Amino acid sequence: MSSGRIVQIIGAVIDVEFPRDQVPNVYEALKVQGAETTLEVQQQLGDGVVRTIAMGSTEGLKRGLDVNSTGKAISVPVGKATLGRIMDVLGNPIDEAGPIGEEEQWEIHRAAPSYAEQAGGNDLLETGIKVIDLVCPFAKGGKVGLFGGAGVGKTVNMMELIRNIAIEHSGYSVFAGVGERTREGNDFYHEMKDSNVLDKVALVYGQMNEPPGNRLRVALTGLTMAEKFRDEGRDVLLFVDNIYRYTLAGTEVSALLGRMPSAVGYQPTLAEEMGVLQERITSTKKGSITSIQAVYVPADDLTDPSPATTFAHLDATVVLSRDIASLGIYPAVDPLDSTSRQLDPNVIGQEHYETARGVQYVLQRYKELKDIIAILGMDELSEDDKLLVARARKIQRFLSQPFFVAEVFTGAPGKYVSLKDTIAGFSGILKGDYDHLPEQAFYMVGGIDEAIEKAKKL
């Protein structure tokens, strides 16, 4: 246990001088004496000086203060004691409910599982959300990205998925709030409490107001807790909101450490940092981690380096569209942009595959006809095209669905729709079984039976 002293403080970056024969390793955690602050070594500058990044506020620190090395990386509580608790990046409880009382602590920097340990599977994970189950089905043990600009519903979709999967799937979940609003973290906690699933969720928060080092590491803290559950032989869910803020924190840290920026000002190590996190989120022969990650898309530009780097790691992408949200269709998932590796007849079956592709074909054709309709009007279309447009508008409305987590705002009770009902409903619309029903009947309902009931009242 070596000790040194602070020689320079620039914002969140602190240089500490140690005796030359006792220089701590990179990623080692240091504690400032007489303060709550934890530092993480990022660089060794030579002459016994290390450059560190602070995990908390640097207010009140000054040169000359003593710093002790802990001899290991940041370690956090793991295991069942973390369930139902809110913790920070260091694993300290922040829910005012006493100490965690864990039996074990793990370091947050760990090696990803080797090729030999990894396991893949094709089991589907039903979400109860029609549009997702139909066009971009999730795999158990897969990685899913929720892409969307500001205010199109990433967090609400994420909360609905957690509620549905936690209640139906009844496994353990870990939620990592990375650089998001404190208000959302609070809403989320109460939503979980009201749904009686809090005792199955471990919450780790590093909110927007935290220093960049904190936001960069909080995703690893949550992941470490999920890895523990996986290694115990469980199927665990890992939710990360928001992966873009993880990248952004990396950009801030990179700039503070004086590295040259790369494209659009991002850190030169963007792909490597993303890989370090994503390669650990994987399923092994012991258990699985199914991860759902919200990805903020800056200025709605999917080609921005941050979302573009994330795409490469995912099995399914759910793209939320501002155009669809502006039509009042929620969840605002774009069925033409969203993709999944599971959308294969050998995995999901022929009927599901043909229905999903049929829905996409009808919507794509409608998109192409919109220009003609705008210029010449509906009357100029052929009879076949008129029928196709009518079905497309029904499909578009039937892709909307009332959410449980939005009941407070909409006043409409939430709906969980099984995969079987989803396929039956869309298959019926495509075949023309419901051509006689008005399109309003399909808006904001659960299964097709509800649409038929609603049509009787119109």
UniProtKB/Swiss-Prot annotation:
Its EC number is 7.1.2.2. Signal peptide: none annotated. One of its GO terms (cellular component) is plasma membrane. It comes from the Bacteria. InterPro entries: AAA+_ATPase, ATP-synt_VA_C, ATP_synth_F1_bsu, ATPase_a/bsu_AS, ATPase_alpha/beta_chains, ATPase_F1/V1/A1_a/bsu_N, ATPase_F1/V1/A1_a/bsu_N_sf, ATPase_F1/V1/A1_a/bsu_nucl-bd. It is a peripheral membrane protein. One of its GO terms (molecular function) is ATP binding. It catalyses: ATP + H2O + 4 H(+)(in) = ADP + phosphate + 5 H(+)(out). Coiled coil: none annotated. Keywords: ATP synthesis, ATP-binding, Cell inner membrane, Cell membrane, CF(1), Hydrogen ion transport, Ion transport, Membrane, Nucleotide-binding, Translocase, Transport. It is found in: Cell inner membrane. Belongs to the ATPase alpha/beta chains family. F-type ATPases have 2 components, CF(1) - the catalytic core - and CF(0) - the membrane proton channel. CF(1) has five subunits: alpha(3), beta(3), gamma(1), delta(1), epsilon(1). CF(0) has three main subunits: a(1), b(2) and c(9-12). The alpha and beta chains form an alternating ring which encloses part of the gamma chain. CF(1) is attached to CF(0) by a central stalk formed by the gamma and epsilon chains, while a peripheral stalk is formed by the delta and b chains. This is ATP synthase subunit beta. It comes from Ectopseudomonas mendocina (strain ymp).
